[in-house]
Amino acid sequence: MMNFLRRAVSSSKRSELIRIISVATATSGILYASTNPDARTRVSLAIPESVRESLSLLPWQISPGLIHRPEQSLFGNFVFSSRVSPKSEAPINDEKGVSVEASDSSSKPSNGYLGRDTIANAAARIGPAVVNLSVPQGFHGISMGKSIGSGTIIDADGTILTCAHVVVDFQNIRHSSKGRVDVTLQDGRTFEGVVVNADLQSDIALVKIKSKTPLPTAKLGFSSKLRPGDWVIAVGCPLSLQNTVTAGIVSCVDRKSSDLGLGGKHREYLQTDCSINAGNSGGPLVNLDGEVIGVNIMKVLAADGLGFSVPIDSVSKIIEHFKKSGRVIRPWIGLKMVELNNLIVAQLKERDPMFPDVERGVLVPTVIPGSPADRAGFKPGDVVVRFDGKPVIEIMDDRVGKRMQVVVERSNKERVTLEVIPEEANPDM
């Protein structure tokens, strides 16, 4: 190992340096490397402690920070930078332009490397803004316990993002609750909050608290940037255990409600394997930057590692509806729809050879009499292939009262374009 490292210092060729260190670490450590277009190569090398001690004997000008502190990691992190560039950068030791520098990257994901403190740092960023919610329950004035959940403070005015089922009585109140919500912060402060908006269909609600002192807030990220396999953390108060952090990965970025056997409206969730339990509802799903990318909503009771969250991009649209109209306005055209894929299309064509020759789309099995779709000329069996110029129907778009063109395929390869004007959906439908 030491001979390899000495050769690395005397090497002026970037490719040779990478080869030397790669071979040296094959049985002695862990290597990460990346090359960018400006001819800089950065190699991060994790070296066992036994070898680390010997490195201090090499004839290098080693700064005190180069030897990694044992309490930070089981392995020390060394970053070697080979600079093959005409820039006037002063090398540390030799005449060939090769230098050795230190970098403490244990807390940052570098080139796919999850540092020791990465999750802890993300949890520390979001933690102060995560709250415990407690809603007294009763029947005709008789106390019947409390509903427990979690939430996230998203602005300095004291707006808390949570789930509707945590703060709304689904049996007796359909749209919103003006009842009391007890809010407890991570630092122990308690407040009395009020539900200001709730949307039962998406299961998203906003609670408001007032504070004379500054409140911690969380930053909202973008769920559209997520990929299956990305690391995420769930923070909340499962079983009233405040400040609980669990970690996992994104299993699916667009799990459909129909896949979960949930009837009614079309919805999509983020699926993760983070541990989510009773009391986690309403708490944030967070990326490694400490940004909220989802609202934890439910888990599958019959299995472990199947948790679901409302994507923050959808939540942001709901919040905009709340600000603009005080409620979520959804278009309704009066169609029962079934989303098609290749498998379903193949099965339908086996039953009926005249079924439209499409790869994807939305099947219309039912048209509600007297609805906008009925007036526009939709028929049962139509397959919607384009909706207002787009290949899919975007459920959350505010299109009420706007004339739209819908392209449908019918039997015998018939294609027609229909015009429909959506009405506002009844929230109780």
Curated annotation (Swiss-Prot):
Region (Serine protease): 113-338
Domain PDZ positions: 318-424
TM ranges: none
Gene Ontology MF terms in the entry: serine-type endopeptidase activity
EC number of this enzyme: 3.4.21.-
Gene3D superfamilies: 2.30.42.10, 2.40.10.120
Region described as Disordered: 87-113
Enzyme class: hydrolase
Active site: H165, D203, S281
Keywords attached to this entry: Hydrolase, Protease, Serine protease
Domain of life: Eukaryota
One GO process term, biological-process aspect: proteolysis
Pfam families (alphabetical): PDZ_6 (PF17820), Trypsin_2 (PF13365)
Family the entry assigns: Belongs to the peptidase S1C family.
General function of this protein: Putative serine protease.
Protein name: Putative protease Do-like 14
